Amino acid sequence: MITVLVILAIAVAVGGLVLAVAFERGPTPGDVALAYELAWDRHDFTTLWSLSSGEMRDGRSRNDFVVDKKAAYRGQIRLRAVVEHVEIEAVAQQNERAASVLTRLDLRDEPPVRNEIRMQRIHGAWRVVSYMLRPEPASTP
């Protein structure tokens, strides 16, 4: 009798775990935007490739993308590790497959910048399809 109860308890636990994994939606668009901004700041080109859509990768393999980005940013030390804080200002999810995130980057020695990161859900994961600098809002006197 105890053996049957133990087997039943294990089966229920495994079933619950399977259901929990099946219903997990993964990172939100805000999570992906935060990771994308930090990857740019750290020149983590492998992570950028993973978070980007095919269009943002220009059709390059992971290895080619990383090699090309490292070559492009070699010697550009002033462009690395300049972000002190990333804030998600707004998330607009148009539907289950499209979202837009506005971020604000507080920089170490420069005024803050804002970006708009557009994403699509591709094969169950949010991927960046567009990354644009947003102009600063006009200040009122």
Identify the residue ranges that each predicted region occupies:
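Short, low-complexity N-terminal intrinsically disordered segments enriched in polar/charged residues
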Residues: M1-R42
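Short, charge-rich amphipathic segments
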Residues: M1-A9, T46-M56, D109-P112, P135-S139
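Exposed beta-sheet edge and beta->alpha loop/turn motif
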Residues: H85-P141
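Extracytoplasmic/periplasmic, Sec-exported soluble proteins
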Residues: T28, E37-W40, R57-S61, L107-P111, ...
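Short solvent-exposed beta->alpha transition segments
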Residues: R25, G30-D31, A35, T46-S100, ...
